[in-house]
Design a protein with these regions (language model features):
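The canonical Cys-X-X-Cys-His
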Residues: 64-67, 110
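Thiol-based oxidoreductase modules, predominantly thioredoxin-like and allied folds used
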Residues: 36, 59, 70-97, 104
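Amphipathic alpha-helical interaction motifs in eukaryotic regulatory proteins
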Residues: 43, 47, 75-82, 88, ...
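Structural cue for short, hydrophobic secondary-structure segments
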Residues: 58-60, 112
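A short beta-strand-turn-helix
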Residues: 35-54, 96
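Non-catalytic, surface beta->alpha helical segment in thiol-disulfide oxidoreductase systems
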Residues: 105-106, 111-139
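N-terminal mitochondrial targeting presequence
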Residues: 1-32
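Short pre-active-site segment immediately N-terminal to redox-active cysteine/selenocysteine motifs
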Residues: 53, 60-63, 106
Length: 139
């Protein structure tokens, strides 16, 4: 369900447009981002060492404003880096055991995993640092 509407933004000031756009959050993901719903799934896909690709995990909550704002960028990166990285999303309210297992206490949190080990962690909607880590660990 879409909470915001861009049709009303035509006369809004830019800051209002950002707030309204951020309220649009679709929990579905592109075909290049997989949802993880359990600790067992997390261990099978992210911790698995057989795949040498970088794995980026986005821990989010549906009520989290910064999570909503950065979600379109995550989708874009998933398309851009699809050959060199796998992308996952975890709703911390639906899979709290995964958040606990990873020590995640703030949203959004982005974990970068390579060869079954966490190589970097970005807390907050910080596109510059996320992009930096994607570039660094996909080379």
């Amino acid at each position: 369900m879409m909470l915001g509407s861009l049709t009303r933004c035509r006369t809004a000031v830019p800051s209002q447009m950002f707030i309204r756009a951020a309220t649009r959050f679709n929990s579905t993901t592109s075909s290049n981002v997989q949802l993880i719903e359990s600790l067992n799934d997390f261990k099978k896909t992210v911790v698995d060492k057989s795949n040498e690709k970088l794995k980026m995990v986005d821990f989010y909550a549906t009520w989290c404003g910064p999570c909503k704002a950065i979600s379109p960028m995550v989708e874009k990166w998933a398309d851009e880096y699809k050959e060199s990285a796998d992308f996952y999303k975890i709703d911390v309210d639906q899979a709290p055991e995964v958040a606990g297992f990873c020590g995640v206490s703030a949203m959004p949190t982005f974990l970068f995993v390579k060869d079954g080990k966490i190589v970097s962690k970005v807390v907050g909607a910080n596109p510059k640092n996320i992009k930096r880590d994607l570039d660094l660990f996909t080379k």
